[in-house]
Amino acid sequence: MKITIGHLYPDLLNLYGDRGNIQCLMKRCLWRGIEAETIAFELGDKIDFSKLDIVLLGGGSDREQMLVCEKLKEIQKDFKAYVEDNGVVIAICGGYQLLGKYYKTDQGMIEGLKLVDMSTEQGKGRLIGNIVMQSDLFDMPIVGFENHGGRTTIGNNKPLGKVLSGYGNDGQSGEEGVVYKNVIGTYLHGPLLPKNPQLADLLISRALEKKYRSEERRVGKECRSRWSPYH
């Protein structure tokens, strides 16, 4: 078994140590005898989403998001097809905002990928601090650190979790993140996956299930039932 992880634009979207999330995925695959490789894509690179099993879209400043905005338009069609075919995506902070239709800032409008029906607008002040949420995906809470000026509205989409302590998407709704098909978006840093290995295992399991179809669907279910998130 093999998983290929695509890290989109880590030279620009790596504000909060997203390489730690890549390292976590690689290590947890290694521990389970799953071959894994990471491909880091820069702005000038062509991305073949059909060869990727997990895509990481990390966080960046508003300036850096503006820099990648034009490139995102070029990959939008292929990225959308990947998502609709149940491709696995983890998007964090700025990357989370870019999943939606737009991010409206004081400096202008950043057009998003339109992969998920959601949008973000800059609010007054930043939402900063430790955060704890409860997700329907796991028995144990998800924890991390948030630091964002954007207020995200996810419409009719399902949130990643309900905030137990902290701010979440907008500081008011009590929701944090978004889940759409096999896409997970969140404001949580930490890095996210080392702090929440159960989430890393979910991404790996879903990637295996999709790649190997019926055979690995059975294996993935067995893996989820026996994997300890802290092993």
Model-derived regions: residue spans:
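N-terminal beta1-alpha1 cap of cysteine-dependent amidohydrolase-like domains
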Residues: 1-84, 194-224
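Amide-donor transfer/coupling interface in amidating biosynthetic enzymes
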Residues: 2, 122-224
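Structural motif
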Residues: 54-58, 90, 185-187
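Cysteine-nucleophile active-site neighborhood
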Residues: 62-135, 139
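Short helix-coil boundary/hinge micro-motifs
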Residues: 220, 230-231
